[in-house]
A protein has these predicted regions:
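Basic, alpha-helical interaction scaffolds
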Residues: 1-19
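RNase H-like, metal-dependent ribonuclease domains
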Residues: 23-431, 438-472
């Protein structure tokens, strides 16, 4: 319910967040809207996790692996712009990428109508425009520029998803041999694969062999296609996916075929996902679209091309050559080319996750001490709802036992009767000598990090033995 309804409402209010951050466009109104929305969102996180009412919002978000809405709004805006860049026919395209001044048209019309007026009137008019700009929120384009620059998104490399060059009913799909893909790679001996590969070679005895492969190391991406002694390599833009590398290699293979006088070819590739995308005629991917268009043209020119999947790194000579060529292309200069917009979406998600991680590292929450790296916490599925709720409160450090006084201004802070010190979850779990016997029976370690690193079941058993489960 939270993800399906509340998160969507929060995301739709991203413009209010931008305006409030910049102090523009009735900030009091936007601040009130955000407070109401954030309050509902925070309450939903508390209900989902079972956290106590006084739990810090940052800890709630970290425990639920819910990125703060301020960052989420920016992430969604940038992802939308990346998708829009691939669709230039979208009516919003020009406004998003070229509409950086909300008063540009107004200024142009007014200036043309004010020709012949006194210079003092022009100066007064310009001052009026400046004041209007201060009261207006920045446009989507203006807000986006700073975020896109920080994230280093190469908008100029995003390929255009236009209308296909070839009519859909004229597109030809190659024949694909999947006989080697039937066997599970993890359980199949390489010699068995090689035997099946020889059967394929014999079956297509009069076909020339082309081998393709893609390679990725850190941010560097490359691809290669090998036919006899001819190799065609491509160094792709940094950050491209391995799928894009494999698809680029297949396109290079068709280029090798088009330059040859030989008629029959079989392309061997170890990318099952690319073959399936080609078979399904996935025109949403610009590289698959290009491959099918090039293949259709080759077939119309009298070429015969079939494809076959082979496993990688089992000693097939042609595949090993293609793999070596693809790896060597990583040291080449980047080839100017456009790539699908989807390749840059993971980079955006990683950028904002790292930004959130930086925020989290500066927090002093108790959860930040035991959970310094942000990732999804998966509770032991055998725990009951009550036990999961208790575990969440133990991890965040806020519970009814230790923080109920915050809800009642007349209540006093709870004290440990054994140690005469402030009662806290850390004191119960780590320090209090009263529970040393139970601690040594159920938990391993002596430091806070070591004790909280025990299994969920062990921590719950310790709390049960101490008699605190129903008090949290």
């Amino acid at each position: 319910m939270h993800l399906a309804v509340l998160s969507c409402l929060m995301q739709c209010n991203s413009s209010s967040w931008y305006a409030q951050q910049r102090g523009l466009s009735s900030p009091e109104y936007h601040l009130n809207v955000l407070k109401r929305l954030y309050s509902v969102n925070n309450e939903a996180l508390r209900i989902c996790s079972g956290a106590f009412k006084s739990s810090p919002i940052s800890s709630l978000q970290a425990e639920c692996n819910e990125i703060p809405p301020q960052l989420r709004h920016q992430q969604l805006a940038l992802q939308y712009a990346i998708k829009l860049k691939a669709n230039r026919e979208n009516p919003a395209y020009d406004d998003i990428f070229h509409g950086d001044d909300p008063l540009a048209d107004y200024e142009s019309d007014a200036s043309s109508s004010s020709e012949g007026k006194a210079e003092s009137s022009d100066e007064e008019y310009r001052n009026t425009l400046k004041e209007k700009r201060k009261s207006l929120p920045p446009t989507f384009c203006g807000r986006l520029q700073e975020v896109a620059t920080d994230c280093e998104v190469p908008f100029d490399l995003i390929s255009h998803q236009g209308i296909p060059d070839v009519e859909p009913w004229l597109v030809r799909v190659p024949s694909i041999d999947y006989r080697l893909a039937v066997l599970p790679k993890a359980k199949t001996n390489p010699h068995q694969y090689k035997a099946l590969y020889k059967e394929v070679v014999e079956f297509y005895g009069n076909y020339s062999h082309v081998y393709t492969d893609g390679s990725k190391k850190d941010e560097k991406v490359g691809s290669a296609a090998v036919w006899l002694d001819t190799t065609r390599k491509t160094r792709l833009p940094n950050g491209c996916s391995i799928f894009t590398a494999e698809a680029s290699a297949l396109i290079d293979a068709l280029k090798l075929i088009s330059e040859s006088d030989t008629t029959r070819f079989i392309i061997f590739t170890d990318s099952l996902s690319c073959l399936q995308a080609i078979e399904n005629e996935d025109m949403s991917n610009t590289l698959i679209h290009t491959y099918l268009s090039d293949y259709t043209e080759l077939v119309s020119n009298g070429k015969e091309v079939v494809m076959c999947w082979i496993p990688s790194h089992i000693g097939i000579e042609g595949n090993e050559k293609a793999d070596a060529a693809a790896k060597s292309s990583l040291d080449d200069d980047i080839t100017p080319m456009s790539v699908p917009y989807s390749d840059f979406l993971p980079k955006v998600r990683e950028y904002f996750h790292n930004l959130w991680q930086g925020w989290w590292e500066r927090r002093t929450d108790f959860l930040a001490l035991i959970h310094p790296i942000l990732n999804k916490k998966i509770y032991d599925p055998t725990l009951s709802r009550r036990e999961q709720r208790a575990l969440c409160r133990i991890r965040i450090g806020h519970s009814r036992l230790t923080h109920a006084h915050i809800m009642d201004k007349h209540a006093e802070k709870p004290m440990c009767a054994e140690c005469n010190c402030r009662l806290s979850m850390k004191h119960i779990m780590v320090d209090c000598p009263k529970y040393q016997h139970e601690r040594s029976s159920f938990l391993d370690g002596s430091t806070t990090e070591e004790i909280y690193n025990n299994s969920d079941r062990a921590i719950i058993n310790f709390v049960k033995e101490c008699g605190f489960l129903n008090l949290l």
